[in-house]
Amino acid sequence: MQIEEKEERILPILFTIIWMLIGYYFLGNILEYAPVVNSIYLGMIATLGITLLITKYWKISLHMAAIGGCFGVFLNLQYIYGGVINYVIFILILSGLLGYSRAILKAHNMQQIYSGFLLGVLMLVSFVSYL
């Protein structure tokens, strides 16, 4: 499935946010997990919410927002706890490859790719930092 028009992305993003909120509620009431997991989950939901708002006007890269969020989490974990620098480097390389593939496929322009990555990084770094 490929969603090329920005208008077609709104409903899938909205459904994803709803399911993540349901999952957050049930997992939070059933399982006890580390506060960092709670922060990551809320950061992902917030990132999706912002991409939903942006998508009404512009086609930001959701792929890059997701991997940017992953990079932001591990970057912050490296800063707080240490010992995950190899993951940080791996995710950064993977991010470059993903961004390159999105550009080659002409799915996004460079602004959309960089903006998506930056949004994901900033959102998840800020949420995980809130620990």
Please state what every model-predicted region is.
Residues 1-15:
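Juxtamembrane helix-capping/reentrant segments at transmembrane boundaries
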Residues 1-4, 20, 39, 43-44:
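"…centered on the first transmembrane helix and the immediately adjacent amphipathic helix/loop
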Residues 24-37:
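Transmembrane alpha-helix boundary signature
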Residues 14-25:
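A generic, lipid-embedded transmembrane alpha helix
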Residues 38-131:
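Membrane-embedded catalytic cores of phosphoryl/pyrophosphoryl-handling enzymes
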